[in-house]
Amino acid sequence: MEIEINYSFIIPHRNVPHLLQRCIDSIPKRDDIQIIIVDDNSDPKIVNFECFPGLNEKCVEVYFTKEGKGAGYARNIGLTYAKGKWFLFPDADDHYTTDLMNVLDKYVNSNYDIIYFACDHIIEKTMEHCDNIISIQIKSYLEGHKDMINNIRYY
């Protein structure tokens, strides 16, 4: 019997293997999780493809493109392989907190079409938090248009 995939994490990647590994490491390894990495034509002078992050991990699928068309293109490629009920789109330089699955599992059987999670922006060199203007704008928009938008949850 095939295990149902609840979450597909689709990660575009280009030339930051150390950050991609951190991202992968922050995603719990569970049978209901699929991790899809789409490398968008990384430079072989920067990336060692024989030791590519996630390549030998059971729940990780790695796809390579030669086009170099950007993160959106890579995400669309990943969508063609996604099997989950829910799609998550971290960037390669993102990483999750340890309570990620506690939050996600609250919504796994919900009827929402979209759940938007705010994120913290951190300056990596100093580990200093900074304002996340985009999250503030999205939250404001969603709260101001509740009558027009159905089945969206802002967490």
Task: Label each region the model flagged.
Residues 45, 94-106:
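Acidic donor-binding/catalytic loop of UDP-sugar-dependent glycosyltransferases
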Residues 66-82:
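Glycine-rich, basic loop-to-helix element that forms the pyrophosphate-binding segment
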Residues 7-19, 23, 30, 38:
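A conserved hydrophobic helix/loop-capping motif in glycosyltransferases and polysaccharide synthases
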Residues 15, 27, 40-42, 69, ...:
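Conserved short acidic donor-positioning loop in nucleotide-sugar-dependent glycosyltransferases
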Residues 24-64:
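Acidic donor-binding segment of Leloir-type glycosyltransferases
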Residues 56-58, 73, 102-155:
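Flexible acidic/His/Gly-enriched loops in nucleotide-sugar-dependent glycosyltransferase catalytic domains
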Residues 87:
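Short aromatic/hydrophobic "clamp" motif used to bind/position activated sugar donors
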